[in-house]
């Protein structure tokens, strides 16, 4: 007789039960994100210049919108590059 495989893989459920990342802005008590603070903004963009998504950084939806606006504003005033040099 055939052996049935378990419906759920226990290794998969253990990997999925990681602790959620906490928003670094909320943890530090930062309410507004300054577009002139390049050191903070560069932590949330890739080496190619793309904005990192929330699921990678753990930023809240509120702060992700503010962060995106600040990065775009910094790009327009030439504080950040639009694309990285290849």
Curated annotation (Swiss-Prot):
GO terms for molecular function: small ribosomal subunit rRNA binding; structural constituent of ribosome. NCBIfam families: S18. Gene3D superfamilies: Ribosomal protein S18. Belongs to the bacterial ribosomal protein bS18 family. This is Small ribosomal subunit protein bS18. Part of the 30S ribosomal subunit. Forms a tight heterodimer with protein bS6. It comes from Protochlamydia amoebophila (strain UWE25). Binds as a heterodimer with protein bS6 to the central domain of the 16S rRNA, where it helps stabilize the platform of the 30S subunit. GO terms for biological process: translation. The keyword Ribosomal protein applies. GO terms for cellular component: cytosolic small ribosomal subunit. PROSITE patterns: RIBOSOMAL_S18. Keywords: Ribonucleoprotein, Ribosomal protein, RNA-binding, rRNA-binding. It comes from the Bacteria. InterPro entries: Ribosomal_bS18, Ribosomal_bS18_CS, Ribosomal_bS18_sf.
């Amino acid at each position: 007789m055939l052996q049935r495989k378990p419906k759920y893989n226990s290794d998969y459920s253990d990997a999925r039960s990681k602790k959620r990342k906490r928003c670094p802005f909320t943890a530090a008590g930062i309410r507004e994100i300054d577009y002139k603070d390049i050191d903070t903004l560069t932590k949330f963009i890739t080496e190619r210049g793309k904005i990192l998504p929330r699921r990678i950084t753990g930023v809240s939806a509120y702060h992700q919108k503010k962060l995106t606006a600040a990065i775009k504003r910094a790009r327009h005033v030439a504080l950040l590059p639009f694309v990285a040099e290849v």
